Structures are given as structure tokens and as C-alpha cells.
Amino acid sequence: MANSTSSGSRAPALSGAGPVMIIGGAEDKLRDRVILARFVQLAGGRDGHVVVVSTASSLGDEATGLYRELFLHLGVGRVSGLRPVTRDEANDPAAGRLMDTATGVFMTGGNQLRLASVVGGTELGAALLRAHERGAVIAGTSAGASAVSTHMMAFGASGASPKHRMAQISAGLGILTNVVVDQHFEQRTRLGRLLSVVSQSPSLIGLGLDEDTAAVIFANQTLEVIGRGAVTIVDGSEIVTDSYQTKGHRPMMVSGAILHSLPGGYRFDLKSRTLLAGPAEAIGKVPRAVETARRRLHRLSREIAAEGADSFVVDRKDRKARELPEASE
């Protein structure tokens, strides 16, 4: 289940809660791919140890191998892979010990229900929380991003208008406690279901992540956007709704929701729910040496994204190209 590219078991010298990077899936499509490079930077670069958790995907072993190759090319000193597929495997003490040496954790896409149901409440799940608390960066892409929060978007329908029973919430991994995360946001028209969840739980902040776009959330609750798309933030603190009266799958009345759409470089204070003045400084270009690995990763990320697509949201072109299995992302 666990493997690594180098030896060593000493816990890294970190302090304080680490950053959390949530990615909207299909990351780094453009030539200057900055999201994974930023993750590597936050994980410590040459001095870092990244653990790739690929439980969410049925392509897990292949995904682990490609991410390992990419992260090594980007300069990480050590990359390990974990892919428990049962709760017994996730309770293996060896998995927890490996996680205890990580400076960065990267959870792949696929099916967030698989990830949360296998890892949540196990030794590996506890080790993941410990890693975050001692300063490791925790990242998830697509399904891995949704699973990061305590309240997880398990599955739901597409559409711009909020409707009753449009989305299902279940328990996630508990790293972020005050948000609910949705991914492939613009590409799969998921505004409606995020609005419906926030209207029913207005204490939560809704975060909708476009593809090839990430939000980095730091310990001080500052959120920074990177990538080519946007992060949609839904603040329900002043919301008015009839969601408790709506029946069936009928449209809900939602008024007073505060929406922010932030492209790369902008920052947001999740504590005060306000935009911070001035965009953040962009990270530099990624070396050309990783181009081949990134192209291979991009092809695989599209397969993983397709694997996790809601069956009723699949694009017509994708339907013609291949038969897609059901998943809950």
C-alpha cells in the first residue's frame, strides 16, 4: 500500500497549522503551470517529503506514479505513495507513521465518497490531521479538494438555479471546518448546488473552484487564488431563503447571498469575509524539464476528472468519446 522513492523517517521540523490547497481539478493545462509548483514550494522543495494519497481514484496506482514523477522533477526531495482501499489498510500503523514524516500531502481526484469513507476516522485520517496541525501543506484536487472540509459536497445535480435536494452533504476529512468546497465549478455549472447548500447552512462559506484554479488557505484564514480560472465565494451571512419550505426538487428562493468571483492573484479574508486589497505576487515559471511529465499528468487528470463526473452532467462530447462510469464527485 505504501511506497516511497527514498529512505528516511525523521519527522520534519514544522510548527503551527499548515496551509491548505484546494484545486478545482484538471490543474495546470497551460504552458506555465503554477499550481503544482506552488504546492512543491509550500511542501519544502528539496527538503520536503510529499505523500500522494490516491484512494479516491480507481486509477490510483497510475496517478501516484505520475504525480511522483512530476513532483520529483519539480524538485521535491522525497515522494511516497499511499493508496488504502479498505479501512483496515487505512488503520495500518505504517500508514500513519509515513504520514507523520510528510511536509506535504496531495490527494488525487476521483470519488470523494470513496476517499472519505475509507480514510475518515482511521489512523491515517488522524495522521492527516496531525500533519496539518504541525505545519504540513495539505492539498487536494477535484474529489480530493471536496473531501478536505468537515462538511463535504458528496454529489449533486448541475444547474445555475438552486433547487431543493440539489446536493448531498456528508462528512469529510475535517481539515477545513467552516467551508464547503465544490470543484469543476464553472465547467460543470455548479453554482446552483453550492447556493442551495449555503442557503441551508449559512454558517458555511461556499467555495467553488474552476478547473486549473486553486485556493490556498493559510492559518490566519487568508485565502489566495492561483491559476487561470476563478474561485467563487458564497457568503450566506445575510441570506434569506425558503429552503425549509420547498419540497421535492423545486426551485428555492434565495436572496441576500453575497457572491465574490476572484481570479488568480486575489486574496480574501475568510474570518471577516472581506476582499483584501491588492493581488498577491505571482510565482515564477515552471522549468521546461517537467513539460513531458506534465503532459502525461494532464491526460491522466482528464481521465480522473471524467471518472468523477456526475452521470447527468457529462458533456455530450465526452459521451461520444467514451463511456463514463458513475461516480460521486
Model regions and ranges:
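Portal/gating segments that form or line small-molecule/metal binding sites
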Residues: 51, 57-101, 107
